[in-house]
Amino acid sequence: MDKELSIKILTPTIDLLSSELKSAIYNLNQANIPALGAVNDFEHVQQLYDFCTYCYLAFKQEKLIAFVFVMDESSLYQSPNYQHFKLNYDSFLYIDRVAVSDLYQRKGIGAELYNHIYLKCIEANIPLCCEVNTLPRNEVSLNFHLKLNFKITEERPFGKKKVAMLIKE
């Protein structure tokens, strides 16, 4: 791991999300569109955060450079993609969104965050789930997930898009 990289794990039931972090998450999310869905405003960031079980944050020199929103099966999140996993698995961790700053993409930051999350899955003996756009095709994300040994379980329509449902056990 990069010595200058620090990873912080927030638990929404315990940790408040500061205005500064909401702003940083919002900006990082918006910079990663269309790979990520847009968030409307800071309140939308807060709503997504409140659905999370964990929020993984990566900092370099105290600047947020990546985040991952993670939910378990008890979340009240209504996303159809999340609900797909909720209907098919008793217990799991679900990655709703991951964003890495342009300057730090393809430098192992995403993999480092995923490894931290997957360790929780190993401890609990549960799968790690997510989806990736296949229409339009997000080749970078698909390759990233397949390299980390995620398996595509099916492809599903999602509005005008299509997504591949992925799982790592």
Where are these regions (language model features)?
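Conserved beta-hairpin
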Residues: Y54-D72
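C-terminal "cap" of GNAT-fold acetyltransferases
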Residues: E155-E169
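Short amphipathic alpha-helix that is part of the acyltransferase structural core
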Residues: D2-E43, F59-K60, L64
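Conserved GNAT acetyl-CoA-binding A-motif
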Residues: C121-T134
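A short, internal acetyl-CoA/4′-phosphopantetheine-binding micro-motif in the GNAT/acyltransferase core
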Residues: D96-Q105, T134-L135
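Conserved acyl-donor/pantetheine-binding loop and adjacent beta-alpha core of acyl/acetyltransferases
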Residues: F69-R97
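Conserved active-site alpha-helix within GNAT-family acetyltransferase domains
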Residues: T134-E154
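Conserved acetyl-CoA-binding loop-helix of GNAT-fold acetyltransferases
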Residues: V100, R106-L119, K147
